[in-house]
């Protein structure tokens, strides 16, 4: 866990107390600079907001300024910490690139199983895509969005609404609400 420039280790008891003090938990994967997490935590003080990113340096500024209900975890999206199992009622992935985007496009088993593991039953998963990042990986925006939608559906996620593109903004939001297929919970 990072707070400003300090890396902290939170023991199981402290983490349990932090989690039990919040009925709703948002986990943002690939949180980048942490602005989304900081802003979300400030807007919803009754919700625990956890940002996960592999790059420690990006998180320093916003983790220092974040409210107490924000937690920043240094971890790779392809190897999510076990402590997050069945915690999230909402998971967000905002503008993925690199290995996170590749994992979504290819259905990387570690990423997909990690998503399944951290989500509570009927959790929502919201993914916002960047056309430029998709283009760098050889995918037009609409085709990349459809590919990710198909990968998630084939992995056993129950899709409640179809994907839709906000073409004028170059961003695709997909899917807005997902729940896990009941038979696939560990």
Language model regions located:
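A short acidic, Gly/Pro-enriched loop at the edge of an enzyme's catalytic core
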Residues: 78-90
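Conserved SAM/SAH-binding beta-strand->alpha-helix loop
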Residues: 55
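Conserved beta-strand signature within the Rossmann-like core of class I S-adenosyl-L-methionine
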Residues: 122-129
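Conserved SAM-binding strand-loop segment of SAM-dependent methyltransferases
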Residues: 68-77
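Class I S-adenosyl-L-methionine
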Residues: 137-186
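A short SAM/SAH-binding and catalytic strip from SAM-dependent methyltransferases
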Residues: 89-106
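S-adenosyl-L-methionine
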Residues: 1-27, 35-42
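A short glycine-rich, Lys/Arg-flanked "PGG" loop and its adjoining helix->strand segment in the class I
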Residues: 107-121
């Amino acid at each position: 866990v990072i707070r400003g420039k300090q890396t902290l280790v939170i023991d199981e008891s402290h983490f349990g107390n932090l989690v039990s003090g919040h009925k709703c938990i948002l986990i943002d994967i690939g949180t980048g600079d942490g602005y989304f997490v900081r802003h979300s935590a400030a807007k919803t003080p009754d919700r625990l907001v956890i940002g996960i990113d592999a790059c420690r340096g990006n998180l320093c500024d916003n983790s220092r300024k974040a409210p107490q209900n924000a937690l920043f975890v240094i971890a790779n999206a392809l190897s999510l910490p076990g402590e997050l199992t069945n915690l999230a009622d909402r998971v967000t992935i905002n503008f993925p690139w690199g290995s996170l985007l590749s994992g979504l496009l290819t259905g990387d088993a570690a990423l997909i199983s990690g998503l399944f593991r951290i989500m509570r039953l009927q959790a929502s998963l919201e993914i916002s895509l960047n056309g430029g990042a998709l283009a760098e990986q050889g995918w037009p925006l609409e085709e990349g969005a459809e590919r990710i939608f198909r990968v998630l559906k084939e992995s056993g996620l129950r899709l409640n609404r179809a994907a839709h593109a906000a073409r004028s903004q170059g961003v695709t939001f997909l899917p807005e609400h997902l729940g896990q297929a009941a038979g696939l919970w560990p």
